[in-house]
A protein has these predicted regions:
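Short alpha-helical scaffolding segments that buttress acidic/His motifs in well-ordered protein cores
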Residues: 45-53, 105-109, 159-167, 188-192
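Divalent metal-dependent phosphate-bond-processing catalytic cores, especially two-metal-ion Mg2+/Mn2+ enzymes
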Residues: 1-35, 82-101, 111, 151, ...
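Histidine- and acidic-residue-rich, metal-dependent catalytic cores
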Residues: 73, 80, 134-173, 229-230
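Basic/hydrophobic alpha-helical interface regions
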Residues: 27, 31, 36-45, 77
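Secondary-structure capping and boundary motifs in well-ordered enzyme cores
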Residues: 68-72, 97-106, 131-135, 180-187
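Active-site flanking loop/helix segments enriched in acidic
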Residues: 50-79, 121-129
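His-Asp-centered metal-binding catalytic motifs of divalent-metal-dependent phosphohydrolases/nucleases
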Residues: 76, 103-124, 139, 160-169
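Short acidic, glycine/Ser/Thr-rich loop/turn "cap" segments at secondary-structure junctions
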Residues: 60-65, 91-95, 117-132, 143-146
Length: 331
């Protein structure tokens, strides 16, 4: 049996580094779920997303974050389309989401991490990861502008609110949406974001080598209390991995099973009885436990595909020497 390729989705069928391949997969899914849908809006959204990450979108620089790259956004978007299809297959007709909601859901997924991407006139920040604490709010602002631009302005504020299901800036209970169906989509957004990245073939290597530097640049590895006392949360990429099992048990399971109401189970209907994402997530957790039991991080030898960020990032120490960290400020 061929090993799964690092640039492909959980089924090893869709190349995530190619936006056109993901678009074709999403459209195929939606043609099976709906009699018609706004395919032109999806095509434009995928094309614009490709240009945004590449730095070909007006006023924006290329996406330079190491972990939150185009592949992740495409992976998450495809996972969401599959959850939506599974939902439509599983519920009564009056509970179905319908094509209009589904298209807005996909557009929201494509741009859920747009808040990491810097403007051309941003001379205060030198890597998008510095926006980590506020990146979802910046994504919301981008979505509002984008949906107005593509004549879907009636959904602009809704999508801006809904994208917060993918982050921690607003608790899910405080996200305001018009009806329960939109909340179901929000729960799917948050779920797809988690299950896609945590089932990635190179998830563990990416956490150690790419996510940790992002957290450092986002000033997220140290917590400061009211008296100014600092507590180190993550000392290194390896320390991040040591604490990942507890994060999964205490945070991820709570979000998937409670806050997001088990919507991950809709993948079973889409895959006709299979749970590819949850199984992939479990494999990564089992692999991590083996690494931790052996206390041998050299076992993590998979090589994630390069992206713009990895090709241009000088290394964490060199970066910090060149650009001492500053508190984030929205630009």
């Amino acid at each position: 049996m061929r090993d799964r390729r690092s640039t492909y989705d959980i089924t090893d069928d869709v190349q995530l580094t190619d936006a056109d391949s993901v678009l074709k997969a999403v459209c195929t899914i939606f043609r099976s779920a709906f009699s018609e849908f706004n395919e032109n809006a999806l095509k434009q959204a995928f094309d614009d997303c490709e240009r945004l990450f590449a730095g070909d979108y007006s006023t924006y620089l290329p996406c330079d974050t190491l972990y939150h790259d185009k592949q992740h956004s495409m992976d998450m978007t495809l996972a969401l389309a599959r959850l939506i299809n599974g939902h439509e297959r599983s519920v009564a007709k009056d509970e179905r989401l319908g094509p209009d909601r589904a298209v807005i859901a996909i557009i929201t997924a494509l741009y859920h991490d747009s808040g990491y991407i810097r403007h051309e006139n941003d001379h205060r920040h030198f890597n998008g990861a510095e926006y980590t604490p506020i990146h979802v709010s910046r994504s919301a602002d981008f979505l509002k502008r984008y949906l107005h631009k593509v004549n879907l302005g009636e959904y602009a504020q809704l999508a801006a609110n809904m994208v917060h299901y993918t982050g921690y800036e607003i608790a899910p209970a405080h996200i305001r949406l018009p009806d329960e169906k939109w909340h179901v989509i929000g729960q799917m957004l948050g779920t797809a974001d988690l299950i896609a990245q945590m089932s990635d073939r190179c998830y563990l290597e990416k956490c150690r080598d790419r996510l940790f530097p992002e957290l450092v640049l986002g000033d997220m590895t140290v917590k400061v209390d009211e008296k100014g006392n600092e507590t180190v949360i993550y000392e290194s990429g390896e320390d991040l991995l040591r604490k990942t099992p507890a994060f999964y048990e205490n945070e991820v399971e709570n979000r998937l099973n409670k806050l997001f109401k088990n919507v991950y189970t809709y993948e079973i209907a889409h895959f006709e009885g299979e749970s590819h994402y949850i199984k992939g997530l479990g494999k990564n957790q089992a692999r991590l436990k083996n690494v931790l039991a052996a206390d041998d991080f050299s076992m993590l030898r998979r090589r994630p595909p390069e992206n713009y960020g990895t090709r241009h990032f000088p290394g964490l120490e060199a970066y910090l020497n060149q650009h001492p960290l500053k508190k984030t400020e929205q630009v």
